[in-house]
């Protein structure tokens, strides 16, 4: 339905129900350049995530949207036992390549990487007694569209993700500030909190409404690619990514419902405690849920 109204970059499907917007490989390649490696992660993000996991005694971590593996690599390097999954094989190949290149390091030899589908995650990933922490960051969950129009697939995916968390464990999941995007038509001001890319030249935001309801947000990226132009000069690559616009209040209900209400839930705005009506407009909302039952 979405594609008949508005053309996205969903050129293939890596796992049933989840469109792979990186299926042609080109977007995955440019995205890898765009986000960089672990050195491109902001110091604030790294300190926050590592501090949160260590504060709660987490060791066994499931990254359910690992992409090229940049966060998983950081966690492996920091001594965590990591299982990494993604629906896009084009993205996973970068993580698999890194594991192969560093296979002589015991931590990387033990790093588990699998292709998996959020809609069948409980069958795709053996959770055992559950993971100490499950992370789904970088606006990843918003890649899952609402193809049926009732958010039933969102509910199923979140229920499966929550089932991976052991009692007392954490789910850390985020989304962009779509409340601001839908009210203004553009992304919030401020730099990306996750990575410090110097290759971005432009990001154009578009909102698609269906029956007066926001159905999809698209971000059109123009990225400078070193050596892609004539005579080795920088060139430019454009690609589009499409997202479901999760607003804060409705997503809060969804994630709490995924735990059957048995959770402690806090919301951060760009790594800081968020208060509705505050002056600072965050780029991302981060939900931290501790499973209590």
UniProtKB/Swiss-Prot annotation:
InterPro entries on file: Gly/Sar_N_MeTrfase, Methyltransf_25, SAM-dependent_MTases_sf
Protein name: Glycine N-methyltransferase
Organism: Rattus norvegicus
Tissue: Abundant in liver.
EC class of the enzyme, as a word: transferase
GO terms, molecular function: folic acid binding; glycine binding; glycine N-methyltransferase activity; identical protein binding; S-adenosyl-L-methionine binding; S-adenosylmethionine-dependent methyltransferase activity; selenol Se-methyltransferase activity
Protein location: Cytoplasm
GO BP annotations listed: glycine metabolic process; glycogen metabolic process; methionine metabolic process; methylation; one-carbon metabolic process; protein homotetramerization; regulation of gluconeogenesis; S-adenosylhomocysteine metabolic process
């Amino acid at each position: 339905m979405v594609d008949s109204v508005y053309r996205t970059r969903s050129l293939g499907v890596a796992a049933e129900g989840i469109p792979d917007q990186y299926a042609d490989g080109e977007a995955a390649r440019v995205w890898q350049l765009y986000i960089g490696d672990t050195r491109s992660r902001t110091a604030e993000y790294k300190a926050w995530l590592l501090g949160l996991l260590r504060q709660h005694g987490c060791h066994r971590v499931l990254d359910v949207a690992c992409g090229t593996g940049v966060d998983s690599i950081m966690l492996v390097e920091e001594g965590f036992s990591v299982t990494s999954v993604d629906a896009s094989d084009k993205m996973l190949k970068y993580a698999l390549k890194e594991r192969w290149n560093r296979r002589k390091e015991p931590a990387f030899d033990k790093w588990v990487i699998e292709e998996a589908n959020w809609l069948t995650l409980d069958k795709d990933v053996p959770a055992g007694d559950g993971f100490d922490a499950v992370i789904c960051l970088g606006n990843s969950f918003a890649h899952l569209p609402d193809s049926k129009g009732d958010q039933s697939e969102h509910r199923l995916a979140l229920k499966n993700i929550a089932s991976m968390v052991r009692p007392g464990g954490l789910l850390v999941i985020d989304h962009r500030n779509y409340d601001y995007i839908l009210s203004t038509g553009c992304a919030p001001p401020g730099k990306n909190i996750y990575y410090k890319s110097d290759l971005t030249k432009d990001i154009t935001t578009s909102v698609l409404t269906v029956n007066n309801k926001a159905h999809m947000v698209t971000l059109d990226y123009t990225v400078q690619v070193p050596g892609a132009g004539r005579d080795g000069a920088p060139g430019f690559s454009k690609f589009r990514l499409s997202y479901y616009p999760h607003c804060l209040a409705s997503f809060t209900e969804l994630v709490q419902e995924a735990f059957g209400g048995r959770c402690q839930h806090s919301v951060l705005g760009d790594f800081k405690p968020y208060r509705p009506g505050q002056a600072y407009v965050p780029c991302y909302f981060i939900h931290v849920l501790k499973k209590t039952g």
